[in-house]
Every structure is written in structure tokens, then in C-alpha cells.
């Protein structure tokens, strides 16, 4: 009887000890981590939203160009790394012109005549890809060189136009305007006097007039008939000068 009672006590104590150990372990481990959602892991998009074959590389903000080789599934041609997305897009156009010619899909329509790149042989394999890469890089470098030369020429012409000497046109002050307006009536009066006296100076005109008054009158005509009234004057001559 006593033995059975002791065994029951031992069993109860062991059960309590095991329950306490399980609670302590659950508290130490904490709540279970949430399950990771199934599906493809998201990654940061580096491709350019507009240009073909262009994507961003690293945190430096540079752009790389990589094109797919036509007729070769899974093969890609690394063209190079560039400072701007536009340069990488031009490199893509140069590489595609070398690989596909006039049927190439271009980022810029004017690349067909602005980029001078030779067409690769039709049966070119992987051995020709380095030549295509070199030709594309040289075409882009030449295009950038032409652009910088044109920009320098435009800036030089603008500086020359800004440093040109000013025109030597006379500058009139308000005093000059008043003087010209004041001299206008005097000139008009002088012209009026000239027209009045037949283009002769005023002093010469009056001098000739005084000289004319000093001239002796002409002698009376001898054959002229006398002046008669209605009753007749009997042919008597009348002196005109007293």
C-alpha cells in the first residue's frame, strides 16, 4: 500500500517537471518566424525603360550595352560600359548595324547615317564578334568626337559675336534735339527770304535797289505823242519827270 502511494507521488512529480520544462523551452524559443511566401524572388530592375540593350551597372550610375547575336540562341555580345544611357544606346545601334545592316532595330533612327560602322560578313561566327565590338566602339567614339567639335565651334562663334566692337552710330543727346529743333525755324526763314529775293542775299538785294534809285531817268522820247484828254490837248507835250 505504501509502495503504491510512493509510486503515484513520483509519477505526479515527474509529470509536473516535464510540463515545466516544455513551458520554459517554448518561452525561450519565442514565436515561430513567418513562412516565406512562395514564388520568384523580386530583384531590382536595371534595364533602361526606353533604350534596347542598355542597363544600369552598379551604384556608380554607369550604363552597359549588351546585344543578342542574331541567329545564335543565347549568345550575347558585350559592347562596353559608358557614362550615359544615350552613349550606350548609340553603341547598341552601332553593333546592330554591324550585325544586321539596314534591318537592324535601332534606338535612334538617325544612327543609320550618323554612325559609320562597316557591315560584318554574313557568315560571321563567334570569331567575328570581337571585330564587331571594336567597330561599334570606334563608331561611337567618332560620333562623340564630331559632337564635341560642333559644340566647340558653336561656342567659339557665339563668343566672337559677343566680343564684336559696337557700331559707330552717332548718339544724340536731349540738348542736340533741342538745338536741331531750334535751328529748324531759322533755316526755314532763311529759305523763305531766299525765295522772296530771287535767290539773292538780303544785303545785296537792298544795295542793288539803292543803286537803281541813283540812276538818272532816261530822256523823254521825241517822237512820242502827247497825252490828251477827251477834249484834245492840241499836241502839247507833257514832261514825265519834274
From Swiss-Prot:
Cell compartments where the protein resides: Nucleus
Annotated region (Disordered), positions in chain: 20-44, 143-184
Domain of life: Eukaryota
Disulfide pairings: none
Keyword Heme: no
Any Pfam family the entry gives: AP2
Stretches with biased composition (Low complexity): 20-29, 148-184
Keyword Cytoplasm: no
Example GO molecular function: DNA-binding transcription factor activity
N-terminal signal peptide: none
Keywords: Activator, DNA-binding, Nucleus, Stress response, Transcription, Transcription regulation
Positions of the DNA-binding region: 50-109
GO cellular component, one term: nucleus
The protein's role, per its UniProt record: Transcriptional activator that binds specifically to the DNA sequence 5'-[AG]CCGAC-3'. Binding to the C-repeat/DRE element mediates high salinity- and dehydration-inducible transcription.
Family: Belongs to the AP2/ERF transcription factor family. ERF subfamily.
Cross-referenced PANTHER family: DEHYDRATION-RESPONSIVE ELEMENT-BINDING PROTEIN 1D (PTHR31839:SF11)
This protein's name: Dehydration-responsive element-binding protein 1J
Species name: Oryza sativa subsp. japonica
Designated gene of the protein: DREB1J
Amino acid at each position: 500500500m505504501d509502495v503504491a502511494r510512493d509510486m503515484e507521488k513520483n509519477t505526479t512529480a515527474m509529470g509536473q517537471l516535464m510540463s515545466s520544462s516544455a513551458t520554459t523551452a517554448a518561452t525561450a524559443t519565442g514565436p515561430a518566424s513567418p513562412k516565406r511566401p512562395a514564388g520568384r524572388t523580386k530583384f531590382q530592375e536595371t534595364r533602361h525603360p526606353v533604350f534596347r540593350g542598355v542597363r544600369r551597372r552598379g551604384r556608380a550610375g554607369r550604363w552597359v550595352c549588351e546585344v543578342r547575336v542574331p541567329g545564335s540562341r543565347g549568345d550575347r555580345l558585350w559592347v562596353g560600359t559608358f557614362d550615359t544611357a544615350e552613349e550606350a544606346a548609340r553603341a547598341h545601334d552601332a553593333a546592330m548595324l554591324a550585325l544586321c545592316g539596314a534591318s537592324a532595330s535601332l534606338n535612334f533612327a538617325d544612327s543609320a547615317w550618323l554612325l559609320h560602322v562597316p557591315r560584318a560578313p554574313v557568315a560571321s561566327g563567334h570569331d567575328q564578334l570581337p571585330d564587331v565590338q571594336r567597330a561599334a566602339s570606334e563608331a561611337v567614339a567618332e560620333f562623340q568626337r564630331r559632337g564635341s567639335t560642333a559644340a566647340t565651334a558653336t561656342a567659339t562663334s557665339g563668343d566672337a559675336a559677343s566680343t564684336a566692337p559696337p557700331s559707330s552710330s552717332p548718339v544724340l543727346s536731349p540738348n542736340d534735339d533741342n538745338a536741331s529743333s531750334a535751328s529748324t525755324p531759322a533755316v526755314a526763314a532763311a529759305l523763305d527770304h531766299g525765295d522772296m529775293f530771287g535767290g539773292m542775299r538780303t544785303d545785296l538785294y537792298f544795295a542793288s535797289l539803292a543803286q537803281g534809285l541813283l540812276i538818272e531817268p532816261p530822256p523823254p522820247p521825241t517822237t512820242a505823242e502827247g497825252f490828251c484828254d477827251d477834249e484834245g490837248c492840241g499836241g502839247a507835250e507833257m514832261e514825265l519827270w519834274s
